[in-house]
C-alpha cells in the first residue's frame, strides 16, 4: 500500500534575533524570570517578512533537499494562525511565490497542533492517490498577534517556518500513524479574536483586540495531560514500546510542560528534542522547525522512529509516528 515519505526538510527564521535582555527595555521582566519559567532564551521577530515569506524560504530549502522543482508539487497545505490575509489563503500566496502552478493549496488552523493535522491530511491524500508530492508547511508571524505590554504572553512567542516534502512510496517508511483530536468546549483557554460584528444594522459598535489571550494555568493542565495520552496512544495503536522510539519531538511551548511529561512517563530525557530556548513558541512552526533542525544537524537519521506530539488552541492535540 502507498505511504507518504518525508524526503525534504527546510526551516527559516527572520534575521532579527531578540534575546531576553532586549525585552527588559520595555517590559518589567528579566532574562532569569523568563528562563526559569519557560526555558526560553531568545526568539526571532520579523520586521518586514510576512508568514508567506517565511513559508516560501523554508519550502525552497525543503524542495532543494528533496531534489524536486516547485512544479513537481501537486499539493500545498499550510498550517498557521497568523495568515497574511483572511483571503486569499497564505498557501495560495506561497503557491504563487514558489511557482508551484500544478499544486492545489489551502490553509488549516489547528494552532500549535497544525503541523500534525497537516501531516494527517497530506498522508491521506497521498495514500488515496489524490496527490503524489505534497509540501507540508508550518509558518507563523506570531509577533503581530502579541500584546507587547503583557509580559506574561509576549515573552513566549517567536516567528518562523518549517517545511517538509512528502512523496508517495511503497517502502516501509514514512508516516506510519497520525492521531488528532479536538475539544471546542474549552476553546476560550487560548484565543485570538476575529473581526467584530459592526454592520450599520447593529446597535452599538464592538471593539476587538486581536491579541493572543491565554489562560496559562488551564493550558498547562491541558498540555501535560494530552501530551502524555497522545504518546501512550500512538505506542499502543502501533503495538510498539518506548524503547523502539529514537526521538520524541514535542510542540516547543514550555520546558516545564516537557519535563513534567518526561517525569510522568519515565522516558529518558535525552529522547526529547527541544530547541525552544533558541526560538520560543512558534506555534504551528515549532514541530517542523525542531524536526528540520535535528535532521539537518545529523541528530536524526534514516530508519529512525520518531513521535511528534502537539497541543494547542481549539483545543486541539495529536501525535504522529514517523519512520525516516
Swiss-Prot record:
InterPro entries: ACP_syn_III_C, ACP_syn_III_N, FabH, Thiolase-like
Active site: residue positions: 112, 251, 281
Keywords from the UniProt entry: Acyltransferase, Cytoplasm, Fatty acid biosynthesis, Fatty acid metabolism, Lipid biosynthesis, Lipid metabolism, Multifunctional enzyme, Transferase
Region of interest called ACP-binding, as start-end residue ranges on this chain: 252-256
Compartment list: Cytoplasm
UniProt-listed GO biological process terms: fatty acid biosynthetic process
Any Pfam family: ACP_syn_III_C
Molecular function, one GO term: beta-ketoacyl-acyl-carrier-protein synthase III activity
Role: Catalyzes the condensation reaction of fatty acid synthesis by the addition to an acyl acceptor of two carbons from malonyl-ACP. Catalyzes the first condensation reaction which initiates fatty acid synthesis and may therefore play a role in governing the total rate of fatty acid production. Possesses both acetoacetyl-ACP synthase and acetyl transacylase activities. Its substrate specificity determines the biosynthesis of branched-chain and/or straight-chain of fatty acids.
Subunit architecture: Homodimer.
Protein's UniProt name: Beta-ketoacyl-[acyl-carrier-protein] synthase III
Source organism per UniProt: Clostridium perfringens (strain ATCC 13124 / DSM 756 / JCM 1290 / NCIMB 6125 / NCTC 8237 / Type A)
Amino acid at each position: 500500500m502507498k505511504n507518504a515519505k518525508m524526503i525534504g526538510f527546510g526551516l527559516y527564521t527572520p534575521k532579527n534575533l531578540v534575546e531576553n535582555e532586549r525585552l527588559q527595555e520595555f517590559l518589567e521582566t528579566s532574562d532569569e524570570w523568563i528562563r526559569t519559567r519557560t526555558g526560553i532564551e531568545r526568539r526571532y521577530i520579523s520586521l518586514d517578512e510576512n508568514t508567506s515569506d517565511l513559508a516560501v524560504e523554508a519550502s525552497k530549502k525543503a524542495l532543494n533537499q528533496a531534489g524536486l522543482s516547485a512544479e513537481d508539487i501537486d499539493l500545498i497545505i499550510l498550517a498557521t494562525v497568523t495568515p497574511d490575509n483572511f483571503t486569499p489563503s497564505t498557501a495560495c500566496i506561497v503557491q504563487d511565490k514558489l511557482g508551484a502552478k500544478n499544486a492545489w493549496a489551502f490553509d488549516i488552523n489547528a494552532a500549535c497542533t497544525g503541523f500534525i493535522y497537516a501531516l494527517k491530511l497530506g498522508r491521506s491524500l497521498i495514500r488515496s492517490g489524490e496527490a503524489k508530492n505534497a509540501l507540508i508547511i508550518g509558518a507563523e508571524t506570531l509577533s503581530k498577534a502579541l500584546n507587547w505590554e503583557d509580559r506574561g504572553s509576549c515573552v513566549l512567542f517567536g516567528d518562523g517556518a518549517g517545511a517538509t516534502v512528502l512523496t508517495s512510496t511503497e517502502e516501509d517508511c514514512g508516516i506510519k500513524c497520525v492521531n488528532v483530536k479536538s475539544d471546542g468546549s474549552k476553546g476560550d483557554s487560548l484565543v485570538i479574536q476575529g473581526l467584530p460584528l459592526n454592520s450599520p444594522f447593529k446597535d452599538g459598535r464592538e471593539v476587538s483586540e486581536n491579541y493572543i489571550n491565554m489562560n496559562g494555568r488551564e493550558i498547562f493542565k491541558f498540555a501535560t495531560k494530552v501530551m502524555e495520552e497522545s504518546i501512550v496512544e500512538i505506542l499502543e495503536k502501533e503495538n510498539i514500546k518506548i524503547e523502539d522510539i529514537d526521538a520524541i519531538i514535542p510542540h516547543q511551548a514550555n520546558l516545564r510542560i516537557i519535563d513534567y511529561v518526561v517525569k510522568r512517563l519515565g522516558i529518558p530525557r535525552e529522547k526529547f528534542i527541544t530547541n525552544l530556548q533558541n526560538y520560543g513558541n512558534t506555534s504551528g512552526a515549532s514541530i517542523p522547525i525542531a524536526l528540520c533542525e535535528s535532521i539537518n544537524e545529523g541528530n536524526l537519521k534514516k530508519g529512525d522512529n520518531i513521535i511528534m506530539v502537539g497541543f494547542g488552541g481549539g483545543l486541539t492535540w495529536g501525535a504522529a509516528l514517523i519512520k525516516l
